[in-house]
Regions:
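Conserved redox-cofactor binding core of oxidoreductases
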Residues: 1-108, 177-201
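Glycine-rich loop(s) and the adjacent beta-strand/alpha-helix scaffold that form part
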Residues: 101, 108-198
C-alpha cells in the first residue's frame, strides 16, 4: 500500500489509501452516460453506495475512478517510463522474461532473467521491486522458492519460505466493456421504436 500511495496523484481523494504527489494520475470520469446515474440511483435504493472502490471497502454501487489525465490513458509507462527512458542510469531490457529472484538469508540479492534464450543475472545494489502483476508476481515468487511448500516440492522447487497464500488467493472480477455509436443518449437509442418492438413480443 505505501508504494501505491506514493505512486498516485489522485485528483479527488487524499487519505490513507490515496496519494496526490505521485506521477500516476487518477481522475473521475470526465463524461458518463445519463443511464449510469440512473443505474447508480436505482442500485442505491437496495444497496450501499461507494464513492471509492480503492479504499477500505470494495463493495457497493457507484462510479469508479480511472487512470487518466486530461481524458487520456495514464499508464505506468506514461507515468514512469516515458519521462525517465533517456536517463543514463536506466536500462530498459526488451524481449526479457524474469525467471526467478535469488535470495541470501531470505534477502533478495539478484534476479535471473532470460533474454532471447540467453540467461542473465542482475545484482541489486539497493532493493528489488517485484511488479509482475496478479499472475506474474506470485508465479515468480513460487519459482524463487516462496510459496506453499507441498506445491513447490511437487514441482521440484526448493522451498525457502513456506508461505501458503502465494498464488492461492486470486480474487478478480470480470470487467467487460463494449462500445457502440448511437444517435441518442437513451438506453434504447430510440425509445418509441423500442416500445413498438417490445409490444410485438408475446410471453
Amino acid at each position: 500500500l505505501p508504494y501505491f500511495v506514493k505512486s498516485e496523484h489522485n485528483e479527488a481523494l487524499d487519505d490513507q489509501y490515496h496519494g496526490q504527489n505521485g506521477p500516476l494520475n487518477v481522475a473521475q470520469l470526465r463524461h458518463d452516460n445519463p443511464f449510469t446515474r440512473y443505474f447508480v440511483e436505482a442500485g442505491s435504493k437496495h444497496y450501499k453506495t461507494n464513492d471509492d472502490f480503492n479504499g477500505s471497502d470494495q463493495e457497493g454501487v457507484g462510479v469508479y475512478q480511472v487512470t487518466q489525465k486530461n481524458g487520456k490513458r495514464c499508464s505506468a509507462a506514461v507515468a514512469y517510463l516515458n519521462p525517465a527512458k533517456h536517463r543514463k542510469n536506466l536500462t530498459i531490457m526488451t524481449d526479457t522474461v524474469v525467471d526467478k529472484i535469488n535470495f541470501k538469508n531470505l534477502t533478495a540479492v539478484s534476479v535471473k532473467c532470460i533474454t532471447k534464450n540467453k540467461v542473465n543475472e542482475l545484482y541489486a545494489k539497493k532493493e528489488i521491486l517485484l511488479c509482475g502483476g496478479a499472475y506474474g508476481s506470485p508465479t515468480i515468487l513460487q519459482r524463487s522458492g516462496i510459496g506453499n511448500e507441498s506445491f513447490l516440492q511437487s514441482h521440484n522447487i526448493e522451498c525457502l519460505l513456506d508461505l501458503k497464500g502465494v498464488g492461492e488467493n486470486l480474487q478478480d472480477h470480470i470487467d467487460y466493456i463494449t462500445s457502440h455509436r448511437v444517435d441518442s443518449w437513451e438506453l434504447f437509442a430510440k425509445p418509441f421504436k423500442s416500445l413498438k418492438f417490445l409490444s410485438l413480443i408475446h410471453i
